[in-house]
Curated annotation (Swiss-Prot):
Keywords: Ribonucleoprotein, Ribosomal protein
Highest taxon in the source lineage: Eukaryota
Region (Disordered): 92-155
UniProt record similarity statement: Belongs to the eukaryotic ribosomal protein eL24 family.
SUPFAM superfamilies documented for this protein: Glucocorticoid receptor-like (DNA-binding domain)
GO-annotated cellular components: cytosolic large ribosomal subunit
Gene Ontology molecular function terms on file: mRNA binding; structural constituent of ribosome
Segments of skewed composition (Low complexity): 124-133
Protein name: Large ribosomal subunit protein eL24
Record-linked CDD domains: Ribosomal_L24e_L24
Organism: Spodoptera frugiperda (Fall armyworm)
Length: 155
């Protein structure tokens, strides 16, 4: 037993009931009754007609009572150690006074600069004296072959 659906109202159409309309372009519409067919032919929007399934769906009619809203899980802050730094180290750095932190940073920068300076000096000392540049070679002039004379009259 095949149960169809009305093209206008959305209600079920049981065998032996309903009417099928075939348009010139080959589109088929099955209607439950003449009321649906007439409304379709008058080009009434089924979403605006109160007794259709589309209207009831649009305005959320006849649905079971809404379930309680899903509770969203809130993210919780969690502190843990990172590779190369234990939790106690991280907490100690965080609780440091800004002046102390600034002094530490300046000291670290100074040490890095000194290191860079010393490596540069060592590199300079070990590098040999630059050689005098050799005289550039003279380029040979290109020999171009003369093309054959054009033959064939006017173009």
């Amino acid at each position: 037993m095949k149960i169809g659906l009305c093209a206008y109202s959305g209600y079920k159409i049981y065998p032996g009931h309903g009417k099928t309309m075939v348009k010139v372009d080959g589109k088929t519409f099955t209607f439950l009754n003449s009321k649906c067919e007439a409304a379709h032919l008058m080009r009434r929007n089924p979403r605006k007609v109160t007794w259709t399934v589309l209207y009831r769906r649009k305005f959320k009619k006849g649905q079971e009572e809404e379930q309680t809203k899903k509770r969203t899980r809130r993210t919780q802050k969690y502190q843990r150690a990172i590779v190369g730094a234990s939790l106690s180290d991280i907490m100690a750095k965080r609780n440091m006074k800004p002046e102390v932190r600034k002094a530490q940073r300046d000291q670290a920068i100074k040490a890095a600069k000194e290191q860079k300076k010393s490596t540069k000096a060592a590199k300079k000392a070990s590098a040999p004296a630059p050689k005098a540049k050799a005289a550039p070679k003279a380029k040979a002039a290109k020999v171009s072959q003369k093309s054959a004379p054009r033959v064939g009259g006017k173009r």
